[in-house]
Amino acid sequence: MSQPVTTTVEVNGFPCRVWTKGKGPKVGFLAGLGGLPRWLPFLDKLAETRTVIAPSLPGYPGATGHTELDSHLDWVLAVRQLIDKAGLAGADLVGASVGGAFAAEMAAIFPAHVGRLVLIAPFGLFDDQEPAADPWAQRRDVLPGLMCADGDKWTALVTPPEGANSVVWPIEMSRASEAAARAFWPLGNTRLEKRLGLIAAPTLVLWGDRDSLLPPSYAQKFAKGINGATRVETVPEAGHLAYLDQPDAVARAVLAHLG
């Protein structure tokens, strides 16, 4: 698996890494919990027919600046800057988990910035009748099974690769968790349901049928709230980060929607 081209942009004066690979029309990817400490097979599949641009959210691996973001509005505006500076304004956008919530915000608040939209188990809603789990309150040994149907997929994501700096790597992983918590703790509820009706982009909502973090029933809540043409698909044998569990199936569904 060849590596992407790495560039850096500044958001609020702090560096954010941008990975680019592939050919064809642009598609952006905002990663879920854990971010992108490494390039993924899922992104390689997309890159066969698309130019994949994957910017790191503030605080995620390859980026800093999350400690300057004190409100949800701060985060939304930072992501808007990131989308612009990564060259993704007007492009199709895929967002997963916490990245999915921000992708939805972009489509709602800045509709001209998003072409077609894919949301993979996005954060942003909360139903006290079917509460989401709190990923920041879990023991380390529980977390892999909460993130993926196959916990080994999560472990592989966060395990230092050969040659990684043994000091820097765990700091980046901890910082990614802290950044997501700053944006979404404790329950991931940003009142996004109030803004879903502003989304006019054609939208695909994907959800792993074994998501132990966000109930799969939330997919219908998103579909019901979004104003644009919306379709829901379930990914079999996949957990919260379905693109780790089933990269080929998720990539096929994404590419079919993007056309």
Regions found by a protein language model. Name each.
Residues 104, 108-109, 115-146:
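Flexible "cap/lid" loop of the alpha/beta hydrolase fold
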Residues 2-4, 165-194:
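Hydrophobic, aromatic-rich cap/lid helix
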Residues 210-214:
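Acidic catalytic loop of the alpha/beta-hydrolase fold
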Residues 53-94, 252:
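Active-site loop/oxyanion-hole signature of alpha/beta-hydrolase fold enzymes
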Residues 199, 205-207:
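Short beta-strand/loop motif that positions the catalytic acidic residue
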Residues 12-64:
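Conserved HGGG/HGGXW glycine-rich cap/lid loop of the alpha/beta-hydrolase fold
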Residues 42, 201, 215-224:
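Short alpha-helix in the alpha/beta-hydrolase fold that links the catalytic acid
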Residues 238-247:
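Catalytic histidine-centered segment of alpha/beta-hydrolase-like enzymes
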